[in-house]
A protein has these predicted regions:
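N-terminal Sec-pathway targeting helices
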Residues: 1-15, 20-22
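Ser/Thr/Pro/Gly-rich low-complexity linker/stalk segments immediately outside membranes or between
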Residues: 25-41
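Alpha-helical scaffolding within the catalytic cores
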Residues: 49-54, 84-86
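Solvent-exposed loop/turn segments at secondary-structure junctions
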Residues: 51, 71-75, 104-108, 138-141, ...
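DNA replication sliding-clamp ring fold and its partner-interaction surfaces
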Residues: 57-64, 184
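Primarily the HKD phosphodiesterase
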Residues: 61-127
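Structural recognition of the beta-strand scaffold that forms the well-ordered cores
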Residues: 65-69, 98-102, 133-134, 146-147, ...
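Signature of lipid phosphatidyltransferase scaffolds
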Residues: 144-148, 152-195
């Protein structure tokens, strides 16, 4: 448990440092894949590197994928978000259990455009056999997190939209640690069971 707490603290500090660095450097730049990490189990994931890492982890999932997202944009044309969406369907067809929690929000009694896109994406995935739930209209779920095979957690600032995958300055982290995955898995279960 001490190791898991250490990893959570280390990741939090790394995210704050990375976010501060990126905020101060807003020029368009591409970061190479990280060649260092706080440990072999904590891997910084910034900017467009997120797509490849997330896509590969989804493609290699064997048992389960649990996802919480603020935004999972809908696109008709083929792009990185469509590839992620289709990789989830492929995983479900391989027998991987997939559950997704998406935000739906209402402001001034109006359903937001973001909520409409999440609903379109969620309904499409549900039609393909993926379990999808939405939070309450009065609650904002701002998470960007996925848990793969109860062993890997990817979390940070990346929404699932084309700009986040290709253009934005974003900072996330991949943690390969069962204790950390269990902690966030419990968090996911609590949200899932209360929707």
């Amino acid at each position: 448990m001490k190791t898991s707490k250490f990893i959570v603290y280390t990741v939090s500090i790394a995210l704050m440092f990375t976010a501060g660095f990126l905020i101060g450097n807003t020029k368009d730049f591409k970061m190479p894949l990280c060649s260092f990490s706080a440990s072999d189990n904590v891997i910084p994931v910034v900017n467009s590197n997120y797509f490849n890492i997330t896509y590969n982890e989804i493609s290699n999932a064997k048992e389960s994928i649990d996802i919480i997202l603020y935004e999972f944009k809908w696109y008709d044309s083929n792009n990185s978000v469509v590839k992620i969406r289709e990789s989830l369907i492929d995983a479900a067809e391989r027998g991987v259990s997939i559950r997704i929690i998406l935000d739906q929000s209402e402001y001034w009694d109006q359903i937001t455009e973001l909520s409409k896109e999440n609903k379109k994406t969620g309904d499409y995935l549900a039609g393909k056999g993926i379990l999808v739930k939405y939070d309450s209209l009065k609650q904002t779920t701002h998470n960007k997190m996925l848990i793969i095979d109860n062993e890997i957690v990817i979390l940070g600032s990346h929404n699932w939209g084309y700009s986040a995958f290709t253009k934005n300055n974003e900072a996330s982290v991949m943690i390969k640690d069962k204790g950390t995955a269990e902690y966030y898995g419990d968090y996911f279960e609590n949200l899932w069971n209360n929707l």
